[in-house]
Design a protein with these regions (language model features):
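Extracytoplasmic thiol/disulfide redox context detector
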Residues: 2-97, 172, 177, 213-218
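Solvent-exposed, acidic/flexible segments
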Residues: 52-53, 67-71, 96-103, 112-116, ...
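Sec/Tat-exported extracytoplasmic proteins
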Residues: 63, 74, 79-82, 110-114, ...
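Extracytoplasmic/secreted envelope proteins and their assembly/folding machinery
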Residues: 72-79, 83, 103-107, 120, ...
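Structural microenvironment flanking redox-active thiols in thiol-disulfide oxidoreductases
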Residues: 81-112, 117-145
Length: 218
């Protein structure tokens, strides 16, 4: 009798454990069945989705011409189409060999000082339009820092602190963990990856729009 009760208790406990496990895992991997477009669900990553908004993380290399094109053409179109329903953040992911990480450090420091988007635009322009893709020395950095409206002294002190380089390294590890194979690649709401041949304007718009449309149905 005692053994039977023990077995019943054990089964009940197991059932509760499995229910908790399912409730814990499902928010991280749940994706609406009618989500449109081409994408990959990263089952090991946690969803960061909040109703009515999509968080887009762009993994990009400042020296990558495709990343510059995405920043110059796709980003403005995405902002125009989705407005405040879309939050775009770039994460530096160096893939071009032989380039120093100074541009990535500058971007991270500017982010810390509230001017990340401005610095991103200036760096892409400097490298791809002004054709300055060599060493970003201190005098050039000062001009760019002033252009985005930041204090050069405070900026350089932040650069020397090591925080920007640590942020760059963390971003690189993140990209490697989710197996970013090319730039630009995007991560939507923490666990929906769009990359490679799927990084067409039409497909990116389709996936984002369908996420928001699914929210509207709820």
């Amino acid at each position: 009798m005692v053994n039977r009760r023990c077995k019943q208790w054990a089964l009940a406990v197991c059932a509760v454990v499995w229910m908790v496990a399912l409730l814990w895992v499902s928010p991280a991997t749940a994706v609406p069945l009618d989500l449109n477009g081409k994408f990959e669900i990263l089952t090991g990553e946690v969803s960061t989705h909040t109703p009515g908004k999509v968080k887009l993380i762009e993994f990009a290399d400042f020296y990558c011409p495709h990343c510059h094109l995405f920043d110059e053409t796709a980003v403005p179109l995405l902002v125009k189409e989705f407005g405040n329903k879309l939050e775009i953040t770039m994460v530096g992911f160096p893939v071009i060999r032989g380039k120093l990480l100074t541009a990535f450090d500058m971007y991270e420091q500017a982010k810390l000082m509230g001017k990340g988007n401005e610095m991103r635009t200036v760096l892409f322009r400097t490298i791809h339009k002004d054709k300055i893709d060599g060493v970003l020395d201190r005098s050039l950095r000062e001009a760019l820092i002033k252009e985005v409206g930041l204090d050069p002294k405070a900026f350089e002190e932040g650069m020397a602190s090591g925080k920007p380089s640590k942020a760059v390294e963390n971003g690189k590890r993140w990209g490697e963990r989710i197996k970013v194979s090319s730039t630009p690649s995007i991560l939507l709401d923490g666990n929906i990856k769009v990359d490679g041949a799927n990084m067409t304007q039409e497909n990116v718009f389709t996936v984002i729009r369908s996420i928001l449309e699914n929210d509207a149905k709820k």
